[in-house]
């Protein structure tokens, strides 16, 4: 596999993942705005973590599939930088409980998501 081909595979997957991320933000925007908590970011991080756990075994032997789905799609879908920025904004706005809750929920639920994805893959695949 050539490096240029790998770039295109990852880029195509990243495009798909980024569009999926944007759609989740649009769908969950009203809840996030209404309650002042970044629900969309939490949702994509937990779902992305589950999917990484679920798909890691099936794509481990397929280098093209792994690059497209694991690196591209899920890399473009999950949002650690957005999570970090939103946490800092909450903290800077004096919302210390929401900032702490955001860190706790993202870390805990994403770990649970990966674990559940692994377990679901064992059962389903």
From Swiss-Prot:
Subcellular location(s) of the protein: Cell inner membrane
Membrane association type: Multi-pass membrane protein
Gene Ontology process terms (BP): cellular detoxification of fluoride
Statement: the UniProt record of this protein carries the keyword Metal-binding: yes
Coarse class of the protein's main subcellular location: membrane
Positions annotated to bind Na(+): 75, 78
Cellular component per GO, a single term: plasma membrane
Pfam families to which the protein is assigned, alphabetical: CRCB
Keyword Cell inner membrane: yes
Alphabetically ordered keywords of this record: Cell inner membrane, Cell membrane, Ion channel, Ion transport, Membrane, Metal-binding, Sodium, Transmembrane, Transmembrane helix, Transport
Molecular-function GO term, any one: fluoride channel activity
Entry-linked InterPro entries: FluC
Activity modulation notes: Na(+) is not transported, but it plays an essential structural role and its presence is essential for fluoride channel function.
Transmembrane segments: 7-27, 36-56, 63-83, 96-116
Reactions catalysed: fluoride(in) = fluoride(out)
Protein's job: Fluoride-specific ion channel. Important for reducing fluoride concentration in the cell, thus reducing its toxicity.
Family in the record: Belongs to the fluoride channel Fluc/FEX (TC 1.A.43) family.
HAMAP family: FluC
Name used for this protein in its record: Fluoride-specific ion channel FluC
Species of the source: Elusimicrobium minutum (strain Pei191)
Lineage, top ranks: Bacteria, Pseudomonadati, Elusimicrobiota, Elusimicrobia, Elusimicrobiales
């Amino acid at each position: 596999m050539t490096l240029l081909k790998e770039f295109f595979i990852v880029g195509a997957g990243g495009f798909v993942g980024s569009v999926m991320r944007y759609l989740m933000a649009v769908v969950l925007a009203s809840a996030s705005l209404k309650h002042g908590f970044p629900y969309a970011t939490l949702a994509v991080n937990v779902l992305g973590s589950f999917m990484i756990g679920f798909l890691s075994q099936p794509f481990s032997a397929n280098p093209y599939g792994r690059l497209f789905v694991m690196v591209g799609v899920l890399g473009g879908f999950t949002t650690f930088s957005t999570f970090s920025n939103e946490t800092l904004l909450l903290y800077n706005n004096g919302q210390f409980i929401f900032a702490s809750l955001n860190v706790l929920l993202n870390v805990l639920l994403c770990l649970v998501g990966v674990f559940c994805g692994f377990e679901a893959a064992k059962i389903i695949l």
